[in-house]
Amino acid sequence: MEPAAPTVQPRAQPPPPDVWPPVGSEEEFYDCPDYYYLRDFPACGAGRINGRTRRERELRTNWLVPGGHERKIAQKLLNSQRKRRQRQLQPRPRTRLT
């Protein structure tokens, strides 16, 4: 019994240039990987210093409110109230000075 010869599928030919859709001046210079690197790895800015781009920061943060300073003040207030309640519930420790 003879092994079957592999059949080769003919490749589809790309359409001629006159059928291609018109592109803008910027699109003809950049292809898909270029846009990827421009978007995710900027050459300068905050992402260069700490290693996270703006897109990564937006994707991986769990805070949806942009007012970080307001959130910090509110969190400090809640923490101080919680500590005050805990101190009131616990008896004062005896020290040697009194």
Swiss-Prot record:
InterPro entries: NUPR1-like (IPR018792)
Keyword Repressor annotated: yes
Any one Gene Ontology cellular component term annotated for this protein: nucleus
Main location: nucleus
Gene Ontology annotations of biological process type: cellular response to starvation; DNA damage response; negative regulation of cell cycle; negative regulation of cell population proliferation; negative regulation of transcription by RNA polymerase II; regulation of cell cycle; regulation of transcription by RNA polymerase II
Cell compartment(s), UniProt: Nucleus
Organism domain of life: Eukaryota
Keyword terms, alphabetized: Cell cycle, Growth arrest, Nucleus, Repressor, Transcription, Transcription regulation
Region spans: Disordered: 1-24, 78-98
Compositional bias segments (type: Low complexity): 1-11
Composition skew (Basic residues), residue ranges: 81-98
Keyword flag Repressor: yes
Family statement drawn from the similarity comment of this UniProt entry: Belongs to the NUPR family.
Reported function: Acts as a transcriptional repressor by inhibiting gene expression at the NUPR1 promoter in a p53/TP53-dependent manner in cancer cells. Involved in the G1 cell cycle arrest, and in a decrease in cell viability and cell proliferation. Plays a role as a negative regulator of the protumoral factor NUPR1.
Record-given protein name: Nuclear protein 2
Lineage: Eukaryota, Metazoa, Chordata, Craniata, Vertebrata
Gene name of the record: NUPR2
